[in-house]
Amino acid sequence: MKRRHEPIYRAAVAVGLGLFGFWRLRKTVTGIDNVPDAGGAVLAMTHFGYLEFALVEWATWKHNRRRIRFLAKKGAFDKPVVGGLLRGMRHISVDMNAGGDAYTHAVTALRAGELVGVFPEAGVSSSFTVRELKTGAARLAAEAGVPVIPVAVWGGHRLLTKNHKVGFRERFGVPVSFAFGAPVSVTPQDDVREVTDNLRTTLQSMVDDLQRTYPVAGEGEWWQPVHLGGTAPTPEQAIAADEERQRRRDAEAR
């Protein structure tokens, strides 16, 4: 399939590459050959920070120049400048109250041979552990007839994440580790809940492996999960905080 000339996408990638080079990020990638040179696939990614979409594109672009169409919340598309960039890069807007259009657009993109990036946790996990996943990645793969590729990122949350202000100098020289797992085949006959639960187990196992080989000790650090000696919230505390935040938003919207 001949690739389109997409100047906005290429410009955005160039800016990202320049920024990550300026920060002197130390990238380690395993399993990148699992990302096909052509054909559709769902990239199901961990979500511990706000820059994983750009970081994963950084890794895939360096490998084979594949462009990823990310599912992003409608609120981002509603912003004047950001929204224009997202549309220009052909990302997919998701209305959390009515996601049918996004699902249809994603299936169409996958069938056309695109890579579609999704965060099945449906939000940043501030415990820095993989929380319960939504079934969207499995459903998309089954309907479009493409595989799911699990993608784990560790270290990217040290650049920008939820509930923690990262200092300017803290971003320099941060190691960022990536793992691209073996493609998972999903058929319409499969139980998508079971596939999704297995995907969660796989992603957490991949994160565990990245943490074991991470070149910086994180004991006592805000970015390390509590079970490894860090000071991040426990999964239960993170869920409770998210629920309270949602209650406040709902109350303000009334």
Named regions from a protein language model:
Residues 109-138:
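Catalytic-site beta-strand/loop segments enriched in glycine and acidic/polar residues
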Residues 37-98:
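Catalytic core of membrane glycerolipid acyltransferases/transacylases, capturing the structured
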Residues 85, 108, 139-143:
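Hydrophobic/aromatic ligand-binding patch that stacks against planar heteroaromatic rings
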Residues 222-254:
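Acidic, Ser/Thr-rich low-complexity intrinsically disordered segments
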Residues 104-112, 174-209:
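A charged, well-structured terminal subsegment
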Residues 29-30, 92-95, 186:
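Short acidic-hydrophobic, aromatic-tinged amphipathic segments that line or gate anion-handling sites
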Residues 128-194, 220-226, 233-234:
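A cross-family acyltransferase "interaction/gating" segment
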Residues 9, 16-47:
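Helix-to-loop junction immediately C-terminal to a conserved catalytic motif
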